[in-house]
Amino acid sequence: MKYKLLIYGIMAAMAFCTTSCYSDFDEPAPAKVWTDADFTADGGEIITIKALKDMCAGVGLAQYKEITDNYIIKGKVISSDQAGNVYKSVYIDDGTAGIELKLMVSNYVYYQVGQTLYVKLKGLAIGNYRYMLSVGGIPSEKDIAKNYANRNLDTQVERDAHIFMGELGQLTEENLPVITRENYKTALTDEYLGRLVRFEGLTYKEGNFDGDRYPQYLETVYLNNATEATYTNKYFKDEGLTPTYAYNYQNQRYYGSSLFTYDATDETDKKGNLIVRVSGYANFALDALPQNGATGAITAIYTKYSSKSGGYI
């Protein structure tokens, strides 16, 4: 009984303090909403994401360019890691281009889809990893040894120094280009890499493309406590499994890849054959793939993975 009375007494004392000793801690000030003026007033220059990508066009694979000028980019958030398929990254788009920001947090909690983010680029590295440019920290020697072109902004201090939250908003048509069977040959270019794209009229196909067979998943194991993983392409049907977007069984989660096409008869058309690559951690990993030949639309981040094009849902 004394224990209960002690707890009640503490609660009463706390209640008294909060009612009689009001302070600013009770109602924290609203978070600052950053605007263009906050950066240009300090001599910063806001450039488009396309301009940033153009100035880094000569950066080779696994290489990076350090930004030494007081440049700032801004764009709306077009990705979310809530579904588990985008990991430690945020993609932003300003209507001219899109790019990945390499962060280290559960991003959907902090950055809302449609919200404007500002990025102070000075001191950051624009890296080229597997044909995709991204914004991150200067890579360490260990990163470079692993062919990483930059690194995640690991600490809150780093993120606070470079990432600034602007106003909430909505995505508009300029943030969501549309590709169709009629326009993909001319409209779908590398300028769409890193952008959220709606692909309409795609056909799901079980079959071959560019030397690979789909659908498949990438088994990733560390044999005999090795530090380097061994990767093996496996096929759902060969393993007696229903084809799904990814593999998630017995606490093992592997990437899955499936083929969607605008031209099912041409296995050499890289623009017309898109690989959808899904993490085994995605909350839709075990959703069944469509029936072979089914047609529909996919909204995805358009990326390259090595020399292949593909869409990350």
Pin down the residues of each PLM region:
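Positively charged n-region of N-terminal signal peptides that target proteins for export
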Residues: M1-L5, S23
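OB-fold nucleic-acid-binding modules
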Residues: Y22-Y87, Y91-I313
